[in-house]
């Protein structure tokens, strides 16, 4: 493929794995924020580092990818980079946004006639490194095939939800389901421990019923052997997602 790509957020929990996969077929540019460990690793693998957004003007970027912590940070970056990009650059935003975030981001890039699409991903750090994430894509339908060129390097499945707003809602609903099932699985095994019920037998029995799930498998397989990191998700990210989810759903008829 050999495209020029700038990845903002390459040092992050998910961004590092995605960047490593992009590097296999492309010229990858990265920029550091505070932490440098993963950036240094990417440079060793062949990535090129830029020291400021101003350097964007000197690069013929085919694609800018963005994967940052939250909507306010993404918007701040968008305002800085949008005047520096050529209108031939495709912006793919991988960030999990609040319900208005993707629309705000699109409006910023629209002012400069820059194509903007979103593609929040499903999966963990391990799936990111293996290149088998799931993508929830949204944007101008004319840009879907072009987006796939980049996303195929680290995504196993790409689902087209139509608009950026629909893709954002789909991501938050997916995270809502993940958080609910994960919490249930954790409480399930905590209760079993208190009641002195064998975890292995309980897990094998649960897999045969309707309670079987991806969360059950990811957590239980390792927890039974004493490894409680089968499903890594930070408290801060959980709080962020629940805040965004509450804002999305609060006006629905069944909200309380």
Identify the residue ranges that each predicted region occupies.
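NAD(P)+-binding Rossmann beta1-loop-alpha1 motif at the extreme N-terminus of oxidoreductases
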Residues: 1-59, 63-66, 125
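Rossmann-fold dinucleotide-binding core
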Residues: 8, 97-175
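Hydrophobic residues within alpha-helices
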Residues: 14, 18-19, 105, 150, ...
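Hydrophobic beta-strand scaffold residues
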Residues: 28, 49, 116-117, 158, ...
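Rossmann-fold NAD(P) dinucleotide-binding segment
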Residues: 53-116
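Active-site-proximal catalytic alpha-helix in oxidoreductases
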Residues: 130-138, 159, 163-195, 204-218
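Interdomain hinge/lid region at the active-site interface
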Residues: 168, 214-256
């Amino acid at each position: 493929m050999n495209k020029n790509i700038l990845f903002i957020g390459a040092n992050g929990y998910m961004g590092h794995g995605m960047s490593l996969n992009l590097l296999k077929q492309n010229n990858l540019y990265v920029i550091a924020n505070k932490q440098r460990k993963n950036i240094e690793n990417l440079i060793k693998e062949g990535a090129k580092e830029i020291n400021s957004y101003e350097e964007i003007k000197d690069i013929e970027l085919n694609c800018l990818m963005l994967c940052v912590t939250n909507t306010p940070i993404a918007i701040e970056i968008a305002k800085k980079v949008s005047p520096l990009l050529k209108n031939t650059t495709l912006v793919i935003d991988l960030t999990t946004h609040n319900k208005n975030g993707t629309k705000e981001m699109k409006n910023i890039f629209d002012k400069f006639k820059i194509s903007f699409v979103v593609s929040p991903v499903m999966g963990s750090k391990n799936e990111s490194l293996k290149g088998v994430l799931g993508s929830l894509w949204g944007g101008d339908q004319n840009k879907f095939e072009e987006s796939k060129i980049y996303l195929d390097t680290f995504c196993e499945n790409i689902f087209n939800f139509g608009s950026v707003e629909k893709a954002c809602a789909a991501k938050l609903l997916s995270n809502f389901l993940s958080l609910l099932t994960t919490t249930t699985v954790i409480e399930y095994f905590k209760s079993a421990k208190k009641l002195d019920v064998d975890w292995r037998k309980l897990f094998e029995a649960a897999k045969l019923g309707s309670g079987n799930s991806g969360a059950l498998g990811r957590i239980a397989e390792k927890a039974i052997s004493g490894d409680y990191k089968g499903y890594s998700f930070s408290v801060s990210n959980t709080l962020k997602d629940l805040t965004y989810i509450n804002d999305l759903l609060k006006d629905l008829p069944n909200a309380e």
